[in-house]
Amino acid sequence: MFTPYGMSTLVKLAAVSVGTLLFSILLPLQAAIPVGSAAAIFLIFSLWFFRDPNRSLPPGKGIVIAPADGTVMSIKACSHPFTGNGSSIISIFMSPLNVHVNRIPVTGTVTLLQHHPGSFSMAFDEKSGEENERMEIGIESNGMKLHFTQVAGFLARRIVCPLSLNEPVTAGKRFGMIKFGSRVDIVIPAGWLPEVKRGAKTRAGETIIARLATTAGNG
């Protein structure tokens, strides 16, 4: 299936690809082959990029699920205004080949939602989390506060986030996407331990990226 968050873009890209394919028929064979091939490859990439596969939420309590497909870039200790001292930030880089639909990491209520305009530096640049265009999201769940940020990158210049303040959300629920490569930063509070390491691959809605310290080692 394809994500509704990118359907308008997908339709436009598909129209351009199909139009180019039809135009290539009118060209001499020597030119038609490369033009038609390029259009076909572009169409296949567009369909692949906006795919939205189903995911199976892992069982268990006291867990945080990856909000994005990608590769863990870094895990660092931090102090954050939403989650407090003793927090940890996990950064996930999403390449253009990853599924770009984002999913809610914990069940709870959205209590923070703030969009920041900014630049479009490479997503793997550490400064991009503070300087690039981004959407901050905070969820409160049974006294626990979790913060995560959709960060636009050099290619990803469109953040989609239809969430609303005070909206109840469920772990694994689709909540938006970042188009064409980007990153997601997740801040977990003190008392929660990262379950992934740098370089690990994540799948949104399936990979456990953090666990409550009292349950660590039980999953």
UniProtKB/Swiss-Prot annotation:
This is Phosphatidylserine decarboxylase proenzyme. The keyword Membrane applies. One of its GO terms (molecular function) is phosphatidylserine decarboxylase activity. It is a peripheral membrane protein. The record marks G181, S182 as: Cleavage (non-hydrolytic). GO terms for cellular component: plasma membrane. Belongs to the phosphatidylserine decarboxylase family. PSD-A subfamily. It holds the Pfam family PS_Dcarbxylase. Its cofactor is pyruvate. InterPro entries: PS_Dcarbxylase, PSD-A.
